[in-house]
């Protein structure tokens, strides 16, 4: 790991550390960095983790670091986004952490609003809404009046976030988090969907959440993203992430959420099964069927007896003869 440090501690008061994992994003990186550097809140350091980029992203990071003394650049061999985030937290100087993806754009007042909401409410995390699209909307940079609401992150409230798909509840952005919370829940390395795996834990250990009710984070949607690409074994990490959520709620003895996540786990596995059949991916199909059998056995206690949809679909895959009999007898 090579670290280029251009930070002058006498010039800046470091209140927030903004961590940006960077990998092959030369097309959008400048726009992202400019939006961060144009924040109305200035007491931050910017940590750029170049995760072994093969394009000019690393050079762009160094170029900005030469001009802006609050930027630290880390060049490392490719280790993945989770390791990049964890390494950024490790070297950060502030008590608050913010993660920004390197192809995204943030509103000029985002950091000011989040920090003020978190500190005024004594919350461990503050969050805003995000806008997901291929292009930035015309009114994205409009002015807002500062306001926030506070929510406790007890298990019942996490359930509400999950049901409403609120704040993209499992993701570490768009938010600021106390460094102590981020350190207590490091991102699992070597996996994708790592934010899905630990997002609910970050919320829980924050104790309370300050919510700024505006869309102040632009999440750049990739038109050739995961949903439009052929399946591979790595994408099955989503199932692993859901299992991590189940394990977390098991530790809290919160059966209701275990049931909800198990339902999503089985549904997602059935979705992957259908994708494998459609793409004639027999090798991956074997893995999916094996996973499905294990999930049904391991988490059977969380599957409602009345859920005939899951029963019908899993019987059709794993027990086709029983499926045909039940269908004739109209048991489903």
Model-inferred region functions:
Residues 97:
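Short aromatic/hydrophobic "clamp" motif used to bind/position activated sugar donors
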Residues 278-332:
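Membrane-interface aromatic/basic loop that binds lipid-linked glycans or pyrophosphate carriers
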Residues 1-37:
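N-proximal low-complexity "stem/linker" segments adjacent to membrane-targeting elements
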Residues 216-222, 228-256, 271, 275, ...:
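Catalytic core of nucleotide-sugar-dependent glycosyltransferases
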Residues 76-92:
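Glycine-rich, basic loop-to-helix element that forms the pyrophosphate-binding segment
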Residues 43-52, 72-77, 101-102:
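Short beta-strand/loop segment that forms part of the nucleotide-sugar
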Residues 81, 102-209, 224-233:
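Donor-binding/catalytic cores of nucleotide-activated saccharide
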Residues 35, 50-60:
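A conserved acidic beta->alpha catalytic loop
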């Amino acid at each position: 790991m090579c670290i280029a440090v251009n930070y002058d501690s006498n010039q800046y008061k470091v209140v927030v550390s903004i961590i940006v994992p960077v990998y092959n994003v030369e097309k959008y990186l400048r726009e992202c960095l400019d939006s961060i550097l144009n924040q109305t809140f200035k007491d931050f350091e910017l940590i750029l983790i170049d995760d072994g980029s093969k394009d000019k992203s690393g050079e762009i990071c160094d170029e900005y670091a030469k001009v802006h003394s609050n930027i630290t650049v880390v060049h490392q061999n490719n280790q993945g986004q989770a390791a990049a985030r964890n390494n950024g937290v490790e070297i950060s100087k502030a008590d608050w952490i913010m993660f920004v993806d390197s192809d995204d754009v943030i509103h000029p007042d985002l950091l000011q609003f989040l920090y003020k909401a978190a500190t005024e409410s004594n919350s461990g995390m503050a969050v805003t809404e995000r806008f997901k699209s291929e292009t930035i909307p015309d009114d994205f940079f409009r002015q807002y009046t500062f306001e926030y609401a506070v929510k406790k992150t007890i298990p019942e409230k996490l359930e509400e976030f999950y049901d409403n798909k609120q704040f993209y509840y499992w993701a570490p952005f768009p938010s600021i988090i106390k460094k102590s919370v981020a350190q207590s829940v490091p991102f699992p390395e070597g996996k994708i969907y790592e934010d899905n795996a630990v997002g609910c834990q970050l919320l829980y250990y924050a104790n309370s959440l300050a919510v700024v009710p505006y869309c102040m984070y632009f999440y750049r949607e990739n038109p050739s993203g995961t949903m439009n690409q052929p399946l591979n074994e790595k994408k099955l990490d989503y199932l692993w992430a859901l299992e991590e959520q189940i394990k977390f709620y098991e530790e809290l003895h919160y059966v209701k959420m275990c049931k909800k996540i198990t339902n999503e786990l089985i549904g997602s596995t059935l979705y992957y099964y259908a994708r494998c059949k459609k793409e004639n991916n027999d090798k991956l199909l074997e893995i999916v069927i094996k996973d499905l059998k294990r999930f049904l056995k391991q988490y059977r206690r969380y599957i409602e007896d009345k859920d005939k949809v899951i029963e019908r679909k899993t019987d059709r895959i794993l027990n086709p003869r029983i499926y045909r009999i039940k269908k004739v007898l109209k048991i489903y």
